Amino acid sequence: MEIDKVFCDTIMYQDLEILQDYLDTFKLDPQLTLILKKYKHASPFWKSDEKSFWIFEGILHDEAERVKQLNGVKTRNKVGFIYIKQIFYDIVELLLEATNDKKASSIDSRCVVCYENEICIKIQPCNHFVVCKSCFNRLNTCPMCRSKINKS
């Protein structure tokens, strides 16, 4: 699963590098390399929250595509550079906010099956405490270890 990778191995990191490459062509802002390197080794990245991971990856990919198009239209244009630079900073800011939100939130207390409801059931006999009641009722095996669930 992509969420188990180190941040520098993710699609998001590659898209951020694409944005940085476009900005580096202008050679106007050496700080961008430092910004990207600062967050390069964020791992694990949004552990157990695949939904948010893919939403953020989609936003980042769309912005990277928009920058590719802008770069073709506004080559070596200072207005184009400023706009692309702002996109880059906005994306890094989104990344930081999301990471901080994950640290502050109770993301680890959400069901590993639906990612929506609070965990409230301890699975027997393995004792994994990872699912909500509605998901538990649909399961025959533990989503963590695949052992057969004793529902008595």
Curated annotation (Swiss-Prot):
- The answer, when asked if rRNA-binding is one of the entry's keywords, is no
Which PROSITE patterns is this protein grouped with? ZF_RING_2
UniProt entry tagged with the keyword Cytoplasm: no
Superkingdom of origin: Viruses
Of which family is this protein a member? Belongs to the IIV-6 157L family.
Question: What are the residue ranges of zinc fingers typed RING-type?
Answer: 111-146
- Got any disulfides in this one, which pairs? none
Protein's name in the database? Putative RING finger protein 157L
Task: State the Pfam families in the record.
Answer: zf-C3HC4_3
Spell out the molecular function terms from Gene Ontology: ubiquitin-protein transferase activity; zinc ion binding
**Keyword set, alphabetical order:** Metal-binding, Zinc, Zinc-finger
